[in-house]
Amino acid sequence: MMLTLSAVTVLAQIRPTIQNLPDGDYRYRDSLALDRPFREIQFRKRDKYITGSDSDKRTGKSYCFRGIPQQNNIINITIAIETPSQTAQQTKWKLAPGSPINFDKLYPLQAGPGLELYKCLTAFLPELKN
């Protein structure tokens, strides 16, 4: 009697963690349904930093953030809050510590980034020196 063993091949679609994503622009939502309010996070991953916008359509609240990816979280977050400016042409930002963002229950979207991301990228630009 001859017994043959063969390796079982398991194919699983593994979703990469935020830390393992290549540099680029991304969008995630807490719901794929378009007929109800949702939370959406748009971000740019560059080197070891993630800069983006966290916007909740249910509450109308949104903020800009910058942090470091760790597994499926963004940690060491700094948030940027837009403050009134004397001139309409210049946006001023107030920086404050923020809470980590977890992506375990968020879904990636194929669509590219929106205007909120580009606004938030300017909040964390280094100041120009004369």
PLM feature spans:
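Beta-sheet ligand-binding and adhesion/scaffold domains
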Residues: 69, 74-130
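Sec-dependent N-terminal signal peptides
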Residues: 1-3
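N-terminal glycine/threonine-rich, aromatic-flanked beta-hairpin/loop signature
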Residues: 34-68
